[in-house]
């Protein structure tokens, strides 16, 4: 067997059924939709309509709400910061903040600020100024000889 001799198993592929292409095709005129009625018309079926049965979105209760004041932080791991330092995109000697992370391509935009999580290892000694950091992340940064400064929420928004 050669690469140019490989083909699908017999009967595993079917040609597309072309609807509404004349009476001789066997599926012309109404194209398998029957005669008249809502389901024979063009356009898709009504979303969420279950044939008169009470639809699922009305059977289940409403739950929760969206807090318009919730802070939306961009999450950055220590591994991503270390990778940016190793690649020369981030200067470990300078203060690492949201603007520096954005310039390095680690984050796209700051939203309500940056939150650092402890995924991965940090070898570089960095001074980081962010809106939030997990306790393990702070411990790892301080263990590497760096420091963490947490911003208040309004100052974090840029």
Swiss-Prot record:
Residues 1-13 have a biased composition (Basic and acidic residues). One of its GO terms (biological process) is translation. It comes from Rhizobium etli (strain CIAT 652). PROSITE patterns: RIBOSOMAL_L15. GO terms for molecular function: rRNA binding; structural constituent of ribosome. InterPro entries: Ribosomal_uL15 (IPR030878), Ribosomal_uL15/eL18 (IPR021131), Ribosomal_uL15/eL18_sf (IPR036227), Ribosomal_uL15_bac-type (IPR005749), Ribosomal_uL15_CS (IPR001196). Part of the 50S ribosomal subunit. Binds to the 23S rRNA. The lineage of its organism: Bacteria, Pseudomonadati, Pseudomonadota, Alphaproteobacteria, Hyphomicrobiales. Pfam families: Ribosomal_L27A. Residues 21-35 have a biased composition (Gly residues). Keywords: Ribonucleoprotein, Ribosomal protein, RNA-binding, rRNA-binding. NCBIfam families: rplO_bact. Residues 1-45 are annotated as: Disordered. GO terms for cellular component: cytosolic large ribosomal subunit. This is Large ribosomal subunit protein uL15. It comes from the Bacteria. Belongs to the universal ribosomal protein uL15 family.
